[in-house]
Each structure stands twice: as C-alpha cells, then as structure tokens.
From Swiss-Prot:
Organism: Caenorhabditis elegans
Family, per entry: Belongs to the short-chain dehydrogenases/reductases (SDR) family.
Matching InterPro entries: NAD(P)-bd_dom_sf, SDR_fam, VLCFA-Steroid_DH
Protein name (database record): Uncharacterized oxidoreductase dhs-5
Domain of life: Eukaryota
Amino acid sequence: MAPTPPPPLSSTLIPEESSTSFFASLHSLLPTFHVENGAQLAVTMLLLIPVVYVGYRLYRTFFAFLKAIFIYTIAPLFYKPNLEQYQHRWTVVSGGTDGIGKAYTLELAKRGLRKFVLIGRNPKKLDSVKSEIEEKHSDAQIKTFVFDFGSGDFSSLRDYISDIDVGFVVNSVGTGRDNLERYGDNPDEDTQILRVNGMGAAEFLSCVLPPMEKSGGGQIVVLSSSQGVRPIPMLAAYCATKALMTFLCESIDREYSTINVQTLIPALVATKMTYYTKGSTFVVTPENFCHQAVGSIGLTKKTAGCLNHELQMLGFHLFPWTILKYLIMPIYYHQRKRVTELHNTSNNPEQEISLQELNEETVVPTTKKTVTRDSATA
C-alpha cells in the first residue's frame, strides 16, 4: 500500500487566511520601511563607522600591549633563546663599532657566542671592539673587515663572506643627520642616507644569505627604526630607508624557510647619533636595549626591542597620523633644538671634546653644520 503523501505545508502550518493577511500586512509596511526605517538604517550605519574604527584601534592597541607584557616581563621567567646552536659558527656584524651594533655584539658574546666577523669602515674602532671582546672572553675568535657601506661596490665583501660558515647576522649599519630638513634641501646628505641605510644595508643581506643558506640556515637580526613605521616630515630619506628594511626583512623571512629574520624597530636609544649619553624615561641605554632584544629572539619576528619602546609604540596603534603628529613632531623639534645648542652654544671645553668624539665618524661635510655619522641607532 502506497504511503499517504503529507498534506500541503500551508494547510498544516499556516492557514490560508492567515497567510494572505500576513503578506498583505508585509506589503503595506514596505513603503514605510523604505522611507523611515531606511533612513534610520543609513544613520545607524554612519554612526557605526567611527565606532568600528575606534574599536579596531583599541583592539590592536590592547593586543600589542599584551604581547609586549608577555615578551618582556613574563617570557624571560621561563624562556631563553637557543643561541648554543650558533656557538661554533660565525656571527657577522655590520655597524658593530658603535651604539646598538656594538652593544648587541657584546651581549651575544656574554651569552656564549665566540666567533665574530666585525665589518666597518673605521679600522681603529674595529680593533677597539675586537680588543674589548677578547679582554672579556679569552676564547673568542674575532675577525675584522674594513668596508664602506656607502661605496656601492660589494664584490670584495661578497667574496670575503662566501667562504664563511655564517650562522648569525646582525645588520645594524646606518647613518643619520642632525637637522630636520625637507627632502632635497640637502641632497648630499639625502643621497648618503639612501646609499648607506637603504642600498648598503639591503645589499649586505644579499651577501650573507647564500652562504648562510648553504650552511643550513640561521638567524638574522636587522636594526630598522620606529621612524620607518609612519612617514615623518623632515625625515623623508631616513624614514624611507627604514621602511624599506622593515618590508625587505619580512619578505626575506618568508622566502627562506631555514633562515629566521627578526626586525628591530626601536625608538630613541642613548647613542652618538641621538646625542644622549645616558638613559631616561623614554630613552634607553644600548646595553639595556640589547639585553631585552636578544631575549626576544624566537618569540617575535618584529619588535621595538624592549618594553619601554613597545609601550611607546602603542601610540602608533592607537592614534591616526592626524592626532599622532601633534605628539611626535614636538619631540623631533626639541631634539633639533637640543643638538643645535650642543653644537653652537657650549663653552664647556669638556663638552666640546665630547662633541668632537661624537662627530669623528663624519661622512659628508656640509655648510649647514649638520653631521652625518655612522652608528647603530633608531
């Protein structure tokens, strides 16, 4: 016997009269919805846009805060970077004669690395850092290679590195300026910054990547800057080169499966380039910075390098440039005023000697009393 087909849906769930009256009522509401409720919907959507925007920025800021707290306060309690794997391989350092580059090298030596290739253009400073490491660690093996990263010819450096078992690389070469000037007002300095911080630092990576991959991979740490996160007026060339290195490093990290690349984007560090001789609330010492930065290896691919700077970077997540510029630019104008006073108004002989030491790495002499120095800094 064939099964009885189910009754029509309308006869069991919705009576015919109810169905007709329901659709009639819905039809009568359509004009009202389009006119009144449609306008209300548009207004609601417009009001939601700033709410979503602010919520998104708060979300980014909150998780950036949690990440910073974890990496620099909680993780050190139980985590240490695995540097033992690089103890018997060479660590190649560019810009390691001053500032962050030098402090980073000393921190690695303190944590057990013993084989270093120091690259820079000042033979005296290279020998000084070499002697300092050997004095603290008698079993250290140090090689030095004199090279100018602004020369444009990397053939000699490429040949020198090609036969080395490279396991760790610190790319901290860089140059900066004192004055805040528009791009093009001082073309010699602009060109030098682009040549050293941009092409020089990038070409150096192309020299170390093949031998490192051939040896089984390794770790690269590149010093960029927080000034490469947002475009900053009067620092166009410097910001552009730091943004270049940040994006280049992120791309390289995804291209080479056996090579880990970490990018450091610090704020102000007490180095010769910034004319700070000691740390403060917002300025950290190179030693403190590098101690925290080395500890973050293996935890993050991009970081400001220390808790102090990570907290400062929260402003980049929270505020758009229309607001952020009123917070950032006064800092740079104050820095320019401070450096100008150091150069022009000091009558203290000891301070004059200090300034002479700061400027001994002059790259491009100019008629504007601005000095470009080789150093490793933000």
